[in-house]
Structures are given as C-alpha cells and as structure tokens.
C-alpha cells in the first residue's frame, strides 16, 4: 500500500513541476492558473494590511467583477476587449502583476490622484517581470520618488527643451528618411505604405541624432544590430506568471546570456559614441556628452544612464510611431479636413521669416496640433496606464483610497466615453480642441500623463508627429485603401510591442 502512496506522491510532484515549468510560457493554461493563484493570494493580504486605514463608510470596493486575463489584454492591446467595459462606472478591478487594481475612469478622479504624481511610486518594473527590470528597471521612467527626482534632474535637459529647438533636425531627418525609403521617387509617383512598418524607425533615428549626432556607417550598423538584440530579449518581458519573480531567472540561462550580450554591446556602443562626440566641433549639441559626464562625475550610475538611454531610444519610439499610424487613416477619410489642414500649412509656409515655420510647429493652437490630439484621443496607445500609487490616503470618487494602493487609468473611458466630449465623442473631429481651452480637458485627456510627472520627451515626440504629418500632407494627397480607421478589427499589436497600431495601408499621391 505504501508503494502506491509513494508512487502517487511522485506522480503528483512530477505533475506540479511540469505545471510550474509550463507556467513560464505565456498564454498557456498553467500560466493562467499560476497568475490567478498569485492574484487571488495577494489581494487579501494587501487589503487586510490596510484595513485600519479604510474609511468606515466608503472603503475601496472589492468588486465581484474580475475580468479573466484582462491584464494580458491590456499589455497586448487586444482589439477584442469589449468597448462596454470602458463605460462601466465605479471601481471595477483588473488583475495586474499579482494585485487587483482600482481603475480610474473620470476626470475628477484623475485630478485628485495625479496632483502630486511626482511623488507617486511606480509598480516594480511596471509589473513586467525580471526581464523588464534587467533592461530598464533603473531608467527614469520606471523609478520613483527621491530616486526619480535625482535621475530626472540629470537626464531630462536634452528632452525638455522648447519644441522649436527640435524642429530643424527633426525636419532634416524626416526628409532624409523619405528619400532613403523611396529613392526612386522623383515626384508624380503614387506610394502605398503602411506607416507602422515603413516609418517604424523614423523616431528611432531622430532620437539617435539628438543623443549621438551624425553616426558613422560603422556605428550605424552596430546600432541596428544592437536593436535586433534588444527586440529579441524584450519578447520575454510582460509574460506574467512566475516571470514576475526575479528568482525565476535561474530557469532561463539562454535569456540571461542574451541579456549579457546586449548589455555589453550597448555599453560599449555608448562609450564609443561618447568618445566620437568629444572629437566633434558640435560636441555640446550631442546629449551623450553631458549625460556621460554626469556618470563620470558621480551624479548618476552607469546602469541608470544605460537604462534611461534604452528607454528613450527603444521604448518611446514604438509609442510615437504607434500614435502616428492612425493619423493618416483619419485624414484620408476626410478630404475636406485634409484640404483645410493643407491650406493652414501653406499659409504658415508663406511667411518667409525663418522663425515663422518653427513657431507654427511649436504651437498647440493649430489645426495640425488638433489633428494629432484628436487621433490620440480616439486611439490611445494603451488601454490602461502603468500602475502607480499615491503617497497619502485620499478621497477619490467617493472612496477612501489608502496610500500605497496601486491604480491604473482606463484611457478609453477617459479619452472617449467621458460625456464632456459631447454627443460626437466617438467621431474624429479635431476642431473640438480649438473650441475649448487646454485647461478644460487637462484631466480628461490622457496622452503624456498627468500632473508634475509626465513623459519627459513629450515635446520631442510631439515635434516628430507635427513635422511628419505636415510633411506628408504638404507633399501628398492621402487616400484610404477602403478600410475605416475606426475599424478595431484592423488594430493589432506590432510584433512584440504592447500597444495598438493601425495595420491598414495608406495611399500617398504626390502633389
């Protein structure tokens, strides 16, 4: 009899080990089961720990609504997420990195929570697991509180200049990119492109120009090879399950080896780029010089610099081109709007003063800026923001939220479904941003974040989009391939990216 018991125990142990091993693979039953256990097991501890802090009448509601695998849908930007979920009010929750997170859906809630966003704590590695932490865990976008303030003060200057500072080199790179992309185009040619694919590396090269200046062919090739390495290892981030725990890295020697190779080549590249920039006449214009000197002076660590550069060059570019991919679709479906925008651009060009065009691009009160904002409103790059917590207890939407409670923002509920956008809230109408003051939608329009802590590169990202849209509309007539930009079935994630992009092609007829 004891033999049968021993055999049963052995079989159970083998089954458990196999289940745990398969839990490291995304989109498997084992992964979902382990993620669920972690989620359910963590929730009571979190709320029990804060029980004494709860308001006696309006505690954070532990809603019975828990949407299975919603966190995975958020990360992968799946288009099958029911739109109705964004219309539900109240505090529903989403499994996120082992916790059930309250979701913010209204402008008043956003204002109450994000008024001190500079003091918020981001979720560890953005709930992306140990691979995410190994790549960018000490980057300026992932750290919090005093750590963030110290690093931000050092690395932000190159990315927080006036938009007008960026226009000349952004415009130069965009013209160069189109000429390299279509070298045979000599005018009068009709092009058919997929913006998310054909223009994917454009923001990458713009930021490269800002950081390193004009790279040699050898350095350019090395950077492209490093990009391939980085793309490969990033596939292992945001997999959920046991990958959320650092100890799980011992099961992945191949991934650790890939990360080691990437980090070595990435550090060597930046060291060489720094040395090359020092020998240039315009060395001070290359951001890598001031940033690398900050490391030499002990203001930031080498890891903090490498992770921040990784974040700027590899992560944010995906968001930028993901945002742009929808704009040509919307403009192609509205010939009258496109014509009006072209006239505005032509009028700005007619002023021959050197600073006139730069000021036009830098302005936020133009139809050009409104077209970009309206596209970002209807097509936020993520369904939910990264989790973060407040430093103090706070009344939010009728609930007493204890300090340290991680929350996310439902970007669709805020950008699209808020009644303040009017009866045409689901329609693409850029003029709405010209009819209201910026203050009126400060807390109901998510794009670069809220409060004191927002994306440090927003001025550069906005400049890239404005110059790119202006260049496209000024030189081409945009026409649709027949699929509507509102068709969610054509929204897919780009490769291993975590955001939605427009998959439709667009027709460009040279003017």
Swiss-Prot record:
Pathway: Alkaloid biosynthesis
Cited PROSITE patterns: CYTOCHROME_P450
Enzyme class: oxidoreductase
Practical use: The indole alkaloid meleagrin was shown to be a good candidate to control c-Met-dependent breast cancer proliferation, migration and invasion.
Annotated InterPro entries: Cyt_P450, Cyt_P450_CS, Cyt_P450_sf, Cytochrome_P450_monoxygenase
Cofactor: heme
Stretch forming the signal peptide: 1-23
Gene Ontology molecular function terms on file: heme binding; iron ion binding; monooxygenase activity; oxidoreductase activity, acting on paired donors, with incorporation or reduction of molecular oxygen
Domain of life: Eukaryota
EC number, as in UniProt: 1.-.-.-
Family assignment from sequence similarity: Belongs to the cytochrome P450 family.
Protein name as it appears in the record: Cytochrome P450 monooxygenase roqR
Source organism of this protein record: Penicillium rubens (strain ATCC 28089 / DSM 1075 / NRRL 1951 / Wisconsin 54-1255) (Penicillium chrysogenum)
